[in-house]
Amino acid sequence: MSQEDVIMPKISIVMPVYNASKYLEEALCSVLGQTFTDYELICINDCSTDGSLETLRTYQETDSRISILNNPEHRGAAYSRNRGMKVARGEYLAFLDGDDIFDEAMFMKAYRTAKEKLADIVTYQYLHVSSENIHNKINRDYSEGYMNRYCRQPFSLSEYEPAELLQFPLGPWNKLYRRSLIEDNHLTFQDLPSGNDLYFVFMALLLSKKTVMVEDSHVMVYVRDHFSSGRISLNRDPMCTYRAFMKVGQEMAALSMFDKLYAHFYYRVFYSLRDALLADGNRERAKQFYGFLQQEGIDHVRSIDSGCYDRLDEYIKNGFQCFIENDFESGWYREENILKLFLYQNVNKVTALFEKYESHGKKIAIWGAGENGRVLLEFCRRHNMHVSAVVDRSKDKQGTELCGFKVASLQEISDDIQVIIISACFIYEDVVRAVGDKNIEVIDINRFLCIA
């Protein structure tokens, strides 16, 4: 065994830093406070002007695991992460941001899972939260079906159904990557103002032979849900998403992966374009991007391999066609989410669920007056599934109208309802507690469909 092998850390943590002084110390403390200690922390200072470099140097003086690279000029997150990867020595790579915080057992649980399962990629829970709620510890309990599918044995997403890839976020910060997987496939972050991680993460997930999720349902990464000065990618231009996936498609074709995985690609592209439109805070720019998709963008996506595109299922092909046939102002894309896809892929299963309760004279309420609630109600209406009420615990939503229903509180409907079907993810335990000893059965539609 060489000296290099002996001193090689198990994990290399790459952290780009740009004007993150408001939260940087907190982020560093949550890394240095990890129960797992065999790592190096590579901080890339991207010409910060707010004292971030001084904070990094202060911590470096007290902990030899910290190294600092200074960019000669402001280059952005992609350049910084790529530079950090070049000097990384760890068996696994992790990418963190300088304004987030991390559960103290994150790396211990992730690395243990990686070694036990011989994984190329380990994923774990994350949550977008506001700064004032970032210290609230949260669990997101998995269903048994979800655990069996994603946590207990490693898998290759290329062997799973295309829609399942949608459940894996394309942010880099909730994953451990085997460094050899990244280096052997020459994966780097794309030089884009935003969305520079999409190509890197998507290709890594497709190329990984063994991916697994940490079985523990504690949230591991708390991502600040804001456009803070600590984030390098502030400008969510939807065109960056388009460019990222065009590169993915071209790379898949070059690696002879497209014929086998074309559906995985097109599913992800459709929903990512939809998400990009919704994420752009500049309405005029979003409208211009939509016009680009109508005029030429969708045709370019189709033409990566028109033969493969023709073999797609009708649901996704119709989705792409909607970009061309509907105008931006119609807002049709707002309701094209993952729940809707899984509902339509499991019509018979969902129909049987409703028929079971209706045959026993049980009345059903939908819990959740948000996007998922609207999607579920529209699905029920189209398939003649009877819903008696809509309930939400938000006082702002109670009394408003959703799909012809007046949104009620639990207290208002609890005497008349025997079944509640939850539309939103990860609130099952909260709803069960709210129902208490009332004689109401609670079903989580996302768990039922193995989305959560």
Where are these regions (language model features)?
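Cell-envelope/extracellular polymer assembly enzymes that use nucleotide-activated donors
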Residues: 9-12, 30, 40, 199
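Short, well-formed alpha-helical segments that are part of the catalytic scaffolds
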Residues: 19-33
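A conserved acidic beta->alpha catalytic loop
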Residues: 30, 37, 45-54, 73
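Glycine-rich, basic loop-to-helix element that forms the pyrophosphate-binding segment
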Residues: 71-88
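Short aromatic/hydrophobic "clamp" motif used to bind/position activated sugar donors
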Residues: 93
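Donor-binding/catalytic cores of nucleotide-activated saccharide
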Residues: 98-215, 220-238, 303-307
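Membrane-interface aromatic/basic loop that binds lipid-linked glycans or pyrophosphate carriers
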Residues: 281-345, 355-363, 382
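Hydrophobic, well-ordered beta-alpha structural blocks that scaffold small-molecule cofactor pockets
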Residues: 334-452
